[in-house]
Every structure is written in structure tokens, then in C-alpha cells.
Design a protein with these regions (language model features):
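Bacterial Sec-dependent N-terminal signal peptides
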Residues: 1-24
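Phosphate-group recognition and catalysis centered on beta-loop-alpha active-site segments
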Residues: 21-139
Length: 139
């Protein structure tokens, strides 16, 4: 009886070991908790890649002139992303001195990096804005 239990436990352990996989790290808003970085900044994306993060999540808003900008908060430094133009949004200075990036700038920077991008399209005020943002974000 003990031999059966030992065999069963060994088989179970062997099966479990075969299914264990390495966990991958995804940087939330990039690697922004380091010097010279800020949430969703180009620097945060590059720094996430520099520490070999599997991916980097970032947030996207649609502006009134149908441009996509990268920022976490609906309103940041007095500018409400979905109620402003891209020109107004990108004039906002991030905490590391960078200008708030457009999605295109973010994608262009990512082309030379290995980290994967995880785009979070933020919830917009109206279904129409949601639909436009959805369509615009599909690259």
C-alpha cells in the first residue's frame, strides 16, 4: 500500500514539475519607478526593455481631433485627454521632463526594442468615442 502511495505521489510531482513554466514580468506603465522615468513615458518603455521585461503595459486615450495619446489618467496636469486636442495633450510635460507621447511615438520607439507592448484602451465617455478609439487603435 505504501508503495502505491509513493508511486502516485512521485507521478503527481513529476507531472507538476513538467507543467511549471518560468513567469514573465510585464511592466505596468513601463519601468517608471526609477530615476529619469515617468509613467507611460518613452523612457519608462526603454527602461522596461533594458531590464528584459517580457512586456510593457501602457494606456491610450483618443483626443477630440481623433489622435491617440499615451497616458494613464483621464485628467493629467489639468488636461482631460478625451476633451482636448492632441496638440494640447502632447504639450503636457511628464514628471521626467518628456512631453506626453502620442501612440505613434510610442510605437516608433518600441520598434527597436524586444519588450512586447500591452495596450490598454481606456474607457471613454461615450460609445461613439469608444468605437472611434477602438478603430483607431487597431494598427
Amino acid at each position: 500500500m505504501n508503495l502505491k502511495k509513493l508511486f502516485f505521489a512521485s507521478a503527481l510531482l513529476f507531472a507538476a514539475c513538467g507543467t511549471i513554466q518560468a513567469q514573465e514580468v510585464i511592466a505596468h506603465r513601463g519601468f517608471w519607478t526609477t530615476d529619469g522615468s515617468a509613467q507611460n513615458s518613452l523612457a519608462a518603455l526603454v527602461k522596461a526593455d533594458s531590464i528584459h521585461c517580457y512586456g510593457s503595459e501602457f494606456d491610450v486615450w483618443l483626443t477630440t481631433d481623433n489622435q491617440l495619446v499615451v497616458n494613464h489618467d483621464a485628467t493629467f496636469k489639468g488636461v482631460t485627454m478625451q476633451d482636448a486636442t492632441a496638440k494640447v495633450c502632447t504639450a503636457v510635460q511628464l514628471d521626467n521632463g518628456e512631453q506626453l507621447p502620442t501612440l505613434q511615438q510610442y510605437l516608433d520607439k518600441a520598434k527597436s526594442l524586444k519588450t512586447r507592448l500591452i495596450l490598454e484602451l481606456k474607457a471613454h465617455k461615450t460609445p461613439e468615442q469608444e468605437t472611434r478609439a477602438d478603430r483607431k487603435s487597431v494598427v
